[in-house]
């Protein structure tokens, strides 16, 4: 059986080549591209300016990735929406819509599961199942935009998975998401997270994109980082920070450091002092995240007073710092709470 072409993962030039290989005119590619990336149709039959013969050929030769919305949970606290989407193979992923005054932001998953093993994160509990394709990552945004009838203005790749562990597909996703012929989201409105895969961070830097890189730091010493994040067994903290500096040098984009505060683990005065020394002189922003509970782990959130104390210590040393607003916590839609499910679990 011949494998069908995942047309929604093709850029316009690749789509043109595919159409030419079918004996079609090149301009057809632009029409199909707009149907997929602007109108977000769910079938080839909806592409009404194509001939019936071409639509039938596309059904035979191509695959139009469409995610099925299985469940939407809405937070009673802040209106955050968590979407459960079914993939064609029966796996499921979660995505989150957050509404702000400045626009609508979507947090997307990059993998089914994750193999990084961060101790406070639900996404990694079952390990890595597979990478998501560029079209499956895009589809999370398209389905949510169609669901709410409003434009998505910001995207954060911080759902299930380690984006840099799915590097090629993430880079292609960025290309498609920011393309002027598609949704055309500004690179500056896109944030990609990583737990610190140094070679991939440098590779991304060399592309000189204008996206924000968010490093999951979570500790100010190598030993504590190893305790919380197994990836620290592969890369020293100094290597990771050097990669962050390299990213800034290449792109001019300020680095965001994500720091989950775990009660009694990484929230002491000494931790704050080490963190100050660690990022001193760097053009960065620190996002403090009160760790969110997951039932399989016994980590607890730092006391509110400790969080404020930690923040004040950083501010007094001239560091740009904020405490992340906890959105969607009551529906397990907050940072570290997204997980891989299979269709049989819903």
Predicted regions, residues:
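Conserved alpha-helical substructure of the radical SAM core
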Residues: 124-154
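Short linear Ser/Thr-Pro motifs
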Residues: 75, 109-110, 123, 193, ...
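Auxiliary Fe-S-binding modules of radical SAM enzymes
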Residues: 1-93, 245-254, 259-346
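Generic beta-strand structural signal
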Residues: 81, 93, 104-108, 116, ...
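Canonical Radical SAM [4Fe-4S] cluster-binding loop centered on the CxxxCxxC motif
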Residues: 99-136
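Conserved AdoMet/S-adenosylmethionine-binding subsite of the radical SAM
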Residues: 145-154, 159-317
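P-loop NTP-binding catalytic core
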Residues: 89-98, 102-103
């Amino acid at each position: 059986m011949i494998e069908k072409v995942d047309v929604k993962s093709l850029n316009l030039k690749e789509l043109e080549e595919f159409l030419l290989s079918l004996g079609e005119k090149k301009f057809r590619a632009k029409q199909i591209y707009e149907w997929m990336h602007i109108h977000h149709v769910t079938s080839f039959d909806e592409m009404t300016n194509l001939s019936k013969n071409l639509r039938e050929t596309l059904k035979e030769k191509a695959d139009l990735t469409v995610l099925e919305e299985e469940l939407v949970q809405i937070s009673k606290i802040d209106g955050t929406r968590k979407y459960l989407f079914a993939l064609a193979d029966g796996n499921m992923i979660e995505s989150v819509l957050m509404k702000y005054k400045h626009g609508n932001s979507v947090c997307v998953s990059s993998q089914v599961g994750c193999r990084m093993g961060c101790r406070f994160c639900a996404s990694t509990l079952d390990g890595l199942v597979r990478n998501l394709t560029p079209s499956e990552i895009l589809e999370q945004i398209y389905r949510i935009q169609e669901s709410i009838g409003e434009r998505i203005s910001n995207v954060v790749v911080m759902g299930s998975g380690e984006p840099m562990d799915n590097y090629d597909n993430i880079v292609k996703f960025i290309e498609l998401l920011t393309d002027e012929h598609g949704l055309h989201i500004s690179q500056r409105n896109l944030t990609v997270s990583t737990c610190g895969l140094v070679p991939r961070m440098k590779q991304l830097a060399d592309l000189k994109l204008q996206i924000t890189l968010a490093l999951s730091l979570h500790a100010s010493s190598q030993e504590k980082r190893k305790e919380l994040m197994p990836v620290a067994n592969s890369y020293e903290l100094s290597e990771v920070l050097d990669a962050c500096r390299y990213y800034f040098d290449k792109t001019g984009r300020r680095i965001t450091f994500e720091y989950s505060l775990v009660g009694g683990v990484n929230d002491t005065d000494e931790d704050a002092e080490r963190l100050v020394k660690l990022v001193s002189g760097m053009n960065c922003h620190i996002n403090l995240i009160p760790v969110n509970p997951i039932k399989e782990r016994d980590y607890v959130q730092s006391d509110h007073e400790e969080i404020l104390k930690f923040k004040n210590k950083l501010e007094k040393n001239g560091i740009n710092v904020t405490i992340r607003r906890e959105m969607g916590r009551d529906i397990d839609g907050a940072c570290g709470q997204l997980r891989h499910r299979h269709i049989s679990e819903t």
